[in-house]
Amino acid sequence: TNIQFLIQEAKQQILKYYTNYNIAHIIINNYKIDSVDYPYLPDEIMCDFICLDIFFVCLPTDLVLYFKNIFSKSNILVDQIICSSYAKSINYKDNLNLTGYISFIDIGFNKTSIISYYNDKILSLDVLPIGGNHITKDISKILEVNLEKSEQLKHNFDQNLKLSNDKDNSIETLQKIIFARTEEILELCAKSIESNSFILGKSRMVLMGAGSKILDNKHKDKISFPNDIDFLEETTENICQSGFKLSIGLNKNEVVIVPKKQIKLGFFEKLFHFFK
């Protein structure tokens, strides 16, 4: 009961001061019980003092409502919206049995998410306003081609493409553009990791997301960056599996958020309960 009270009190403080955000995940990183740290809550315990380290993952309320409204038009109610970058990182870390300091870099269209861990403890989650689309724009500007052509060149840069009759538009030039912007993204990620996670020096990075598909492990030597980098090949099945495994309790430290009020069932949900 005391644990529930502390979590609820912390949740109310977040909702009070971050009015434009919706709480997607609540993770308990540590239980400090009578000055002793526990990664998990002991089954039986008597104590005089208890303190929780709680990590909140929040999403903009406008974004949550946007997706809920899309499904609502088809009479489908959304019970939960999760942070895909967080869900994927938890799943891949578990599948690959990764330990120590590790950061997952999820490169999207216009944004890049960075989730850092130390073993099973999540240290930070940050979002940078830069992504794969910035590489496309760089190619478009320097090679003077439209965005559609730039996107095509970006995804086929390691093949023997004839860019144009212009001798300056060579494969080498294209690669330099892509690697330069990629190095910038990685450097910004490294700074974020150091400032938010207090990880000094080199740490392992795993790149994922649609924006990272232009690269793979054979290009690692061409990128000037000190950290150990791995490129993760993702499929739609991997992403969906990540969300499913998180929803059934993959992260044992995550708190299950229960709605205060009974939500009105949609048509298909009513049908499901009728035949259940």
Q: Predicted segments — roles?
A:
Residues 1-102, 161, 171-179, 196-201, ...:
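Nucleotide/phosphate-binding catalytic cleft detector across ATP-hydrolyzing
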Residues 21, 100-107, 147-153, 245-261:
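A polyampholytic, Gly/Pro-enriched intrinsically disordered region
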Residues 61-69, 86, 117-215:
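Phosphate-binding glycine-rich/basic clefts of nucleotide- and phosphate-handling proteins
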Residues 72, 97, 220-226:
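Short, solvent-exposed amphipathic alpha-helical segments in soluble enzyme
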Residues 85, 128-131, 231-237, 250:
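Short, acidic/turn-prone active-site loops that include or flank metal/cofactor-
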Residues 91, 134-138, 236-243:
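Short, charged, surface-exposed secondary-structure boundary motifs
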Residues 93-125, 139:
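Gly/Thr-rich phosphate-binding beta-strand-loop-beta motif of the actin/hexokinase/Hsp70
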Residues 221-247:
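Conserved phosphate-binding/catalytic loops in two-lobed NTP-binding clefts
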